[in-house]
């Protein structure tokens, strides 16, 4: 079938939302994991995992479980899905996390470079998280202004490689391109085990069972 037929009418608009104009490749990261590839692929479809594992997302209001969100499956094969979250300007969700002593929220945590949290409006609906899983092994992300295609490459029943392909748009201005590249460097720092804002790595967590 064609890509449009394979994805179906519910999924195709989300793909078109990201790839609505020419893109420019910004680089990639590669990570080898000792777990089954399906654990990672299913994990990214779980909207609760980020607030339970990732201190950076929770503390700095990129993703919290009590944000407004949606989860949509394709209406054909039932194997593709999209999850999104949209922070509300008047939401004070930090109080809920403090009240219940959630480990991934740390009120005193500050960034050396707060400009990483800047957001440029690029879409009609400015979601903070847009995670689009395309069966069998592709994930398309938009987290704030960071966009990437993730490849999940099985190597054996108990090992896989995860590749993040980062991109921007060809007409990015200098400031927007710099903002995108900051998150590419954050990802690389994380993989080299330099100090970054995170509690647990999704890939590593998959191999703990």
Give residue ranges: language-model regions.
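C-terminal catalytic domain of Rieske-type non-heme iron oxygenases
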Residues: 1-209
């Amino acid at each position: 079938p064609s890509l449009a037929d394979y994805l179906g009418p519910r999924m195709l608009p989300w793909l078109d939302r990201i790839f609505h104009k020419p893109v420019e490749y910004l680089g990639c990261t590669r990570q080898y994991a000792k777990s089954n590839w399906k654990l990672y692929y299913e994990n990214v479809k779980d909207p609760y995992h980020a607030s339970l594992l990732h201190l950076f997302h929770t503390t700095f209001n990129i993703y919290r479980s009590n944000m407004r969100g949606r989860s949509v499956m394709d209406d054909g094969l039932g194997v593709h899905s999209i999850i999104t979250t949209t922070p509300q300007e008047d939401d004070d969700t930090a109080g809920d996390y403090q009240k219940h002593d959630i480990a991934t929220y740390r009120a005193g945590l500050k960034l050396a470079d707060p400009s990483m949290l800047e957001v440029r409006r690029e879409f009609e609906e400015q979601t903070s998280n847009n995670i689009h899983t395309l069966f069998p092994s592709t994930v398309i992300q938009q987290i704030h202004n960071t966009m990437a295609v993730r490849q999940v490459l099985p190597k054996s029943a108990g090992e896989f490689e995860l590749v993040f392909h980062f991109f921007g748009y060809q007409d990015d201005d200098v400031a927007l391109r710099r903002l995108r590249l900051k998150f590419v460097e954050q990802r690389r720092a994380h993989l080299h085990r330099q100090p970054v804002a995170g509690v647990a790595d999704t890939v590593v967590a998959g191999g703990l069972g």
